[in-house]
Structures are given as structure tokens and as C-alpha cells.
């Protein structure tokens, strides 16, 4: 994670600290007791709204610690598509209160959290990076696990992650084995948008592989194998719709796919995060069209 991303997360938590329960003519409840300015909330991207929602739940409780996806967004860690607003938390002791005392849309997990695994920033408590990664295998989805692995391997060596998993206590062995296999087997992608697209495709058992337009700097399109040397290319636009990041000319990925004569599915990152089902529907249509085309005699193409 770069300095700009770290500064953005710190600034967002500081903004929430100022906004929380400040007098407002148009408040928006992020928890049952915490409000922010509605216009400010609506201006935030969905992942930032998740950070604010988790921060509100942590503030409302004297001891609750954010877990899994909700701790991941506090770190800027990559996660799978949005699921719901139910926040996962735990108490340090691991003993949840009676369900009648749970705040609205909050789920207490029966897992202890040590002091050395807890980070506190602006009165927000959440687990550290490596503990968060393990919790994604306990409570997260396969897309959470795949994208978080890409992110984690850009911050830690494989050996460091394997050693942490080996030393982790209080978790079922099969969960730790799954984490080991994923860390060992993933080729990390350097961009969240392509990491997320690959994770969504993999969760639907669709094989794909990345093209690196420049080694170790940025990934090109994802290539989906339709069988028999037939392929389609996936291009995910960033938040600005531009393809010129990392110093590449505008639309380099589209030029690459055009040069290789691949049919292309182009999708927006924010839509992929919020509605992956629509993305998969479009990929399915493109695959079927390619397979149908190649089932015809060549003079009918």
C-alpha cells in the first residue's frame, strides 16, 4: 500500500472523528446511535462507506474489535465484492454478549483477540494485517481470500506469511492448510481491479490468466480460456475510466487485445465490486458467442 492510500485512510478516519454525531440538518445514521452528514456519506465510495460503518460500530462499543472484511477495509486490504452491512466483531475474551444485546446489523464472533493483535486508531479497534488474513479464511468468502492474498504478498514475503500461519493457535487445522495452499499457489496481481476480477471468475470455476504488459509493474487484461485455443479478454476500468495508470499510454490494454484479435469484455471496477453477478452474466454471454462462432464453418464467421 502506497503513502497516498495510507494518507487517505488516515484522513477518512479523522474526517469520521469530526463528523460523528456533529450537529447536522441532514444526518445519516451509520449505526443506531452514530450519525454523519448525509451528503458526506453519499459522496464516499462503497469501500469507504464500509470503513465508516465499521468505525461507527467500534466507537459505539467500549471493547468490540472489528474482524475479517471490516478490519480489512481499515487497512486498505483488498476484499471480494460487497455482501451486506452486517459488521463482524469480537470481544478480547472471545465470549460474545447475549444476542439481545447485539447492536443492529452486528455479529459477534466467538474468537479471542490478543492485545498484540489489536490496532487502535481514532478510537477504532481492529485486528492487525496477518490476523485479519486468517479471519478471512474463517469468516470470509473465497473472493475475499484470493484478493487479500494478492494484497498481502505485496507487503510480506511468502515465508513470513507461512511462518505466521504455522504459529497461529486456536484455529481449525483445515482452515490453516487452506491458507497455506493459497499463499503458496497464487501468482499475485499488482492491481486490485484485476485481482477482484480474477477472484470472481475463479469463484465461478472459470479459468483465466493475467497478461503482464510490463513485468512486476502492472497487469494487462485477464484472458479467459474458452477451450480449443479460443479466448476472450477482460478489461476492468478504474474509478476514472482511464487506462493510463502506471505510465502506460491511454487504452494500452485495449490496443493489446485488438492486436491479438480477442473479443473483449470491458467492465467498471465499482460495478464489479457491487454487482459481480452482472459481470459474470456478460462474461457468460461473451464465452457462449465465441464458442458458437467457432462451431460454425469458417466461411460463416
Residue ranges and their predicted role:
Residues 1-171, 288-301:
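Short gly/ser-rich loop at a beta-strand->alpha-helix junction or flexible surface loop bordering the NTP-binding
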Residues 154-301:
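Surface segments flanking catalytic/ligand-binding clefts of nucleic-acid enzymes
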Amino acid at each position: 500500500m502506497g503513502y497516498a492510500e495510507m494518507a487517505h485512510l488516515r484522513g477518512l478516519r479523522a474526517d469520521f472523528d469530526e463528523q460523528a454525531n456533529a450537529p447536522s440538518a441532514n444526518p445519516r445514521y451509520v449505526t443506531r446511535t452514530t450519525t454523519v452528514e448525509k451528503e458526506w456519506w453519499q459522496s464516499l465510495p462503497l469501500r469507504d462507506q464500509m470503513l465508516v460503518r465499521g468505525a461507527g460500530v467500534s466507537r459505539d462499543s467500549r471493547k468490540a474489535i472489528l474482524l475479517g472484511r471490516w478490519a480489512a477495509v481499515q487497512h486498505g486490504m483488498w476484499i471480494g465484492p460487497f455482501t451486506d452491512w452486517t459488521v463482524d466483531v469480537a470481544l478480547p475474551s472471545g465470549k460474545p454478549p447475549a444476542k439481545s444485546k447485539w447492536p443492529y446489523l452486528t455479529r459477534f464472533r466467538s474468537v479471542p483477540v490478543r492485545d498484540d493483535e489489536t490496532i487502535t486508531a481514532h478510537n477504532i479497534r481492529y485486528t492487525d494485517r496477518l490476523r485479519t488474513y486468517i479471519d478471512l479464511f474463517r469468516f470470509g468468502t473465497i473472493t475475499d481470500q484470493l484478493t487479500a492474498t494478492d494484497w498481502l504478498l505485496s507487503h510480506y514475503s511468502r515465508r513470513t506469511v507461512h511462518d505466521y500461519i504455522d504459529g497461529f493457535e486456536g484455529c481449525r487445522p483445515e482452515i490453516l492448510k487452506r491458507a497455506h495452499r493459497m499463499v503458496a499457489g497464487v501468482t499475485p496481481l499488482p492491481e486490485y481491479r484485476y485481482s477482484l476480477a480474477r477472484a470472481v471468475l475463479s469463484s465461478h470455476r472459470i479459468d483465466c490468466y493475467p497478461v503482464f504488459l510490463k513485468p512486476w509493474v502492472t497487469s494487462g487484461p485477464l484472458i479467459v480460456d474458452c477451450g480449443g485455443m479460443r479466448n476472450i479478454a477482460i478489461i476492468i476500468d478504474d474509478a476514472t475510466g482511464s487506462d493510463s495508470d502506471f505510465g502506460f499510454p491511454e487504452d494500452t490494454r485495449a490496443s493489446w487485445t485488438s492486436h491479438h484479435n480477442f473479443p473483449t469484455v470491458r467492465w467498471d471496477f465499482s460495478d464489479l465490486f457491487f454487482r459481480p453477478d452482472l459481470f459474470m452474466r456478460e462474461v457468460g454471454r461473451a464465452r457462449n458467442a465465441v464458442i458458437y462462432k467457432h462451431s460454425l464453418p469458417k466461411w460463416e464467421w
